[in-house]
């Protein structure tokens, strides 16, 4: 039997406010435990929550960016459950009336464009954190501690429809969402610090069946690689379970990266288990059109619009434009390089950024912001390819030297110091060609007999004689001329 995987994602995006969603405590990461929790965060009697306007503005910005409906009136609700790091005994969230409804997000899986519909995005507070390895009793027995610094940190939970059909598609969506929230400046995107966490709802069904299978939820996956592995394992587990005559149980599961498996945490609750009801301490969040218009006026150019502009203004293929707009920093870098080149050379800039620059960044695990070769420096290097000073092959060596900081990272200085200027003198190139032809009469005869590989062999020997510095185009033209 052939099976289809059905995936929906719930992503907890930590909003980049300086203070918490309902209190004035700092959201700074890494402080000593319980030093950033005030009376509201600790749920002390008499303390009342006050809504953080900045969190609401970031939610509005996201809603506009995905084409969702920003609710003119949304309501905060109490989500009731017990957990040691939830001091109030409930979490303030949104249920029936979220701040954003609907919207879409488009992304690429390889070179195929996909679009996923969003169900909603709602504001809520984060819980605290249980610490299990840092404490022990006087007797030496293990103990747990609670750090409430994170309690009350503002989150925007973004929920998709169950429309994704592969782990690769889910990861591509998650990457696109991560890119968007960082692009908008509403989240720093730091997955190691928990700023962007995914819950994956996974089920399987026979191909062609309309009804969904029983889903499980994989909680708090904080890396794209682990997200893909967790979904693949869980789908495989469910298929094997059903084929062996078992039944999938609706439950919450945790992904264990060390064992590359999911394991059961608890039975999965339904909404009625949380006994949602409107929070009496918080008035409805009312968002007028003036507020929405003000947020829209401050929006940056969105990735989709920038992709379309790169295709129209620079003649880039859709795939290239998508790759160059994975982040605002990458898009700005490309545009700065392209603008410093002669008209019609933007594709060459794109090739270099998607090739040498991206490969080096990936190898060193750096972001484009940390690239030691600036956009202006890269443009200077590419201009030396365009004007024939160096070949594309030599340029790669120069780029590596620039990255390492040789000669201050200046392309011209490196070319001069290493004597890398391309030989473009037709007389000098012609003399080299004559020597190679004289030394290889058999290969010349093979070419004249119609063997194209013989021509390539001659070109290789000429370039070797020139130590890679001969202009390849001139070599090809003069060689053809001499061979007749």
Swiss-Prot record:
InterPro entries: Asn/Gln-tRNA_amidoTrfase_suB/E, Asn/Gln-tRNA_Trfase_suB/E_cat, Asn/Gln_amidotransferase, Asn/Gln_tRNA_amidoTrase-B-like, GatB, GatB_C_1, GatB_Yqey_C_2, Gln-tRNA_amidoTrfase_suB_CS. It comes from the Bacteria. The keyword Ligase applies. Disulfide bonds: none annotated. Pfam families: GatB_N, GatB_Yqey. Keywords: ATP-binding, Ligase, Nucleotide-binding, Protein biosynthesis. PROSITE patterns: GATB. GO terms for molecular function: asparaginyl-tRNA synthase (glutamine-hydrolyzing) activity; ATP binding; glutaminyl-tRNA synthase (glutamine-hydrolyzing) activity. Its EC number is 6.3.5.-. It catalyses: L-glutamyl-tRNA(Gln) + L-glutamine + ATP + H2O = L-glutaminyl-tRNA(Gln) + L-glutamate + ADP + phosphate + H(+); L-aspartyl-tRNA(Asn) + L-glutamine + ATP + H2O = L-asparaginyl-tRNA(Asn) + L-glutamate + ADP + phosphate + 2 H(+). Signal peptide: none annotated. GO terms for biological process: glutaminyl-tRNAGln biosynthesis via transamidation; translation. It is an enzyme of class 6 (ligase). Allows the formation of correctly charged Asn-tRNA(Asn) or Gln-tRNA(Gln) through the transamidation of misacylated Asp-tRNA(Asn) or Glu-tRNA(Gln) in organisms which lack either or both of asparaginyl-tRNA or glutaminyl-tRNA synthetases. The reaction takes place in the presence of glutamine and ATP through an activated phospho-Asp-tRNA(Asn) or phospho-Glu-tRNA(Gln). Belongs to the GatB/GatE family. GatB subfamily. Heterotrimer of A, B and C subunits. This is Aspartyl/glutamyl-tRNA(Asn/Gln) amidotransferase subunit B. It comes from Bordetella pertussis (strain Tohama I / ATCC BAA-589 / NCTC 13251). The gene is gatB.
């Amino acid at each position: 039997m052939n099976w289809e995987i059905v995936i929906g994602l719930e992503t907890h995006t930590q909003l980049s406010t300086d203070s918490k969603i309902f209190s004035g405590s700092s959201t700074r990461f890494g402080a000593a435990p319980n030093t950033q929790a005030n009376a509201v965060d600790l749920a002390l009697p008499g303390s009342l929550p006050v809504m953080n306007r900045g969190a609401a503005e970031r939610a509005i910005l996201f809603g506009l960016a995905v084409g969702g409906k920003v609710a003119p009136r949304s309501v905060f609700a109490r989500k009731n459950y017990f957990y040691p790091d939830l001091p109030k005994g409930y979490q303030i969230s949104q249920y029936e009336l979220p701040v954003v409804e609907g919207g879409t997000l488009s992304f690429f899986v390889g070179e195929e464009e996909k679009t996923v519909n969003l169900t909603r995005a709602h504001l809520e507070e984060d819980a605290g954190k249980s610490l299990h390895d840092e404490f022990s009793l006087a007797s030496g027995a293990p103990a747990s501690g609670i750090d409430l610094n994170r309690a009350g940190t503002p989150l925007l939970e973004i929920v998709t429809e169950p429309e994704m059909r592969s782990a690769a598609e889910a990861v591509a969506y998650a990457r696109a969402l991560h890119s968007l929230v960082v692009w908008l400046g509403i989240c720093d995107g730091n997955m190691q610090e928990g700023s962007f966490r995914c819950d994956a709802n996974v089920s399987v069904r026979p191909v062609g069946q309309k009804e969904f299978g029983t889903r499980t939820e994989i909680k708090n996956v904080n890396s794209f690689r682990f997200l893909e592995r967790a979904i693949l394992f869980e789908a495989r587990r469910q298929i094997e379970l059903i084929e062996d005559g078992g039944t999938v149980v609706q439950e919450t599961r945790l992904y264990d990266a060390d064992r590359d498996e999911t394991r059961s945490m608890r039975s999965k609750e339904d909404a009625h288990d949380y006994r949602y009801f409107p929070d009496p301490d918080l008035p409805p969040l009312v968002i007028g059109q003036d507020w929405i218009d003000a947020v829209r006026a401050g929006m940056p150019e969105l990735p989709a619009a920038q992709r379309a502009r790169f295709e129209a203004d620079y003649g880039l293929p859709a795939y290239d434009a998508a790759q160059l707009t994975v982040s605002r920093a990458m898009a700005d870098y490309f545009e700065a390089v392209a603008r410093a080149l002669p008209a019609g050379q933007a594709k060459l800039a794109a090739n270099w950024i998607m090739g040498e620059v991206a490969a080096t960044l990936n190898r060193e695990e750096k972001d484009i912001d940390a690239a030691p070769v600036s956009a202006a420096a890269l443009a200077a290097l590419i201009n030396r390819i365009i004007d024939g000073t160096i070949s594309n092959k030599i340029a790669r060596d120069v780029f590596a030297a620039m990255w390492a900081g040789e000669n201050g990272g200046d392309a011209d200085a490196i070319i001069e110091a290493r004597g890398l200027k391309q030989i473009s003198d037709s007389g000098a190139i012609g003399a080299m060609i004559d020597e190679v032809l004289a030394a290889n009469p058999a290969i010349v005869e093979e070419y004249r007999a119609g063997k194209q590989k013989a021509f390539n062999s001659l070109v290789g020997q000429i370039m070797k004689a020139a130590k890679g510095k001969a202009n390849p185009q001139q070599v090809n033209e003069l060689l053809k001329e001499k061979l007749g």
